[in-house]
Amino acid sequence: MSEGEIVQVIGPVIDVKFPIDKNLPNINNALRVIKSENESIVLEVTVELGDGVLRTIAMESTDGLRRGMKVEDTGGPISVPVGEDTLGRVFNVLGQPIDGGPAFSKDHPRESIHKEAPKYEDLTTSREILETGIKVIDLLEPYVRGGKVGLFGGAGVGKTTIIQELIHNIAQEHGGISVFTGVGERTREGNDLYFEMKASGVLSKTAMVFGQMNEPPGARMRVALTGLTLAEYFRDVEGQDVLLFIDNIFRFTQAGSEVSALLGRMPSAVGYQPTLATEMGQLQERITSTKKGSITSIQAVYVPADDYTDPAPSTTFAHLDATTNLERSLVEQGIYPAVDPLESSSSALDPEVVGKEHYEVATRVQHVLQRYHELQDIISVLGMDELSDEEKLIVARARKVQFFLSQNFFVAEQFTGVPGSYVPIKETIKGFKLILDGHLDDLPEDSFRGVGPIEDVLKKAQEMGVTPSDPEAKALLEK
């Protein structure tokens, strides 16, 4: 193995010179800087500058590094432990356990984090809907098993809360293997999630990988690949259906932009790296379903300053099967989850996939909400009195639909004190159909807010002293 020395340290970027007469390490190879007998730092080769000098990115803090320190080539890319033993464990970007448990032996099976995407002929598609138990998602932007989903939203609109609720609902119902990857997010949230999953018994079927906010950009750039490598092993070698949660995919792009200028690349739009689309494509094309198994991925995507035209979120859009857009104006109204029902979309909202009844109810919901959206300008200027009776009815039903799209989450119970609810798709469709058909016109709006199935609305209305006059609603209440 060839040996070189550090010639320059620029923050997280290190230049290393190797003898020209020996084989230079390949791009993406891992290099090791020996700081002391027990301590070393891993670098990854990114650019060859010429004259035997390689520009590398550090995966750990570069404190204490200086010119002249010896660097050795490991002979290959960063490789991480894979297999059943990774379940129930927490790793960093290098595949080292950070949960206080035993380390993995050197002869344990390992895989490189850099791989080619599966070949075109090996791919497969699924038309099976993945039930989440969240009404707004199941009705208007259903997720496909083996598909890619993006949760888009600005700061503090509830992306991580929805991801945690999906982990709670799907991982427990799904019963299969899950991989959670924390990319550049808060360490506290990762810590909370770990103990929550441990308490609920899901941890034994979950591998967790973290490269959080305090990590150098190199770790945040590569940690998504580490999590994906674990998921790929379960898909390709064990033939499993895997759930891959990534929070937050924007931080992967952000880390790349942090080091892009230091690597000598010319910045592109808004200061992002010119290789943004390529890097995103290389990651996303590996997250797919093959004939051996599937990876269903749910990715949170931070939207800087709520601007969806920003290159980072807009590059991510192209790779997704379904998008769940979170809207700040709904947060301000206290509607949680704050999912925008008109902006969110899914390729699976098709009568051939979800069925005729589901499709019709979903399009009717979108139509009534769109009509309400159009009437809001008139209402804000002239008031409700200027609307026709038909328009007043549309507004009343639309507001009930909007409130009924909200629900309480299991993971938020410790903050709200209200138990969460899991609503099956059939119950969701039944509830919205009753509202749209006018069976619940005489119930107060507030009875629809933050409830589970439609039966909860009727009970809440009864507690408010209102009994429905409609025979169908009465029959439901008597049940």
UniProtKB/Swiss-Prot annotation:
The opening ranks of the lineage are: Bacteria, Bacillati, Bacillota, Bacilli, Lactobacillales
UniProt entry keywords in alphabetical sequence: ATP synthesis, ATP-binding, Cell membrane, CF(1), Hydrogen ion transport, Ion transport, Membrane, Nucleotide-binding, Translocase, Transport
Give the top-rank taxon of the lineage listed in the UniProt record for this protein.
Bacteria
- Could you tell me what reaction this enzyme catalyses? ATP + H2O + 4 H(+)(in) = ADP + phosphate + 5 H(+)(out)
* NCBIfam families noted in UniProt: atpD (TIGR01039)
Which SUPFAM superfamilies does the entry mention?
Answer: C-terminal domain of alpha and beta subunits of F1 ATP synthase (SSF47917), N-terminal domain of alpha and beta subunits of F1 ATP synthase (SSF50615), P-loop containing nucleoside triphosphate hydrolases (SSF52540)
Self-association state and partner proteins as the record states: F-type ATPases have 2 components, CF(1) - the catalytic core - and CF(0) - the membrane proton channel. CF(1) has five subunits: alpha(3), beta(3), gamma(1), delta(1), epsilon(1). CF(0) has three main subunits: a(1), b(2) and c(9-12). The alpha and beta chains form an alternating ring which encloses part of the gamma chain. CF(1) is attached to CF(0) by a central stalk formed by the gamma and epsilon chains, while a peripheral stalk is formed by the delta and b chains.
The record, for Pfam families, names: ATP-synt_ab (PF00006), ATP-synt_ab_N (PF02874), ATP-synt_VA_C (PF22919)
Q: Where in the cell is it found?
A: Cell membrane
By its UniProt entry, which InterPro entries does this protein fall under? AAA+_ATPase, ATP-synt_VA_C, ATP_synth_F1_bsu, ATPase_a/bsu_AS, ATPase_alpha/beta_chains, ATPase_F1/V1/A1_a/bsu_N, ATPase_F1/V1/A1_a/bsu_N_sf, ATPase_F1/V1/A1_a/bsu_nucl-bd
Output the Gene Ontology terms for molecular function.
Answer: ATP binding; ATP hydrolysis activity; proton-transporting ATP synthase activity, rotational mechanism
Q: What is its main location?
A: membrane
Q: PROSITE patterns per the record?
A: ATPASE_ALPHA_BETA (PS00152)
**UniProt-recorded name of the protein:** ATP synthase subunit beta
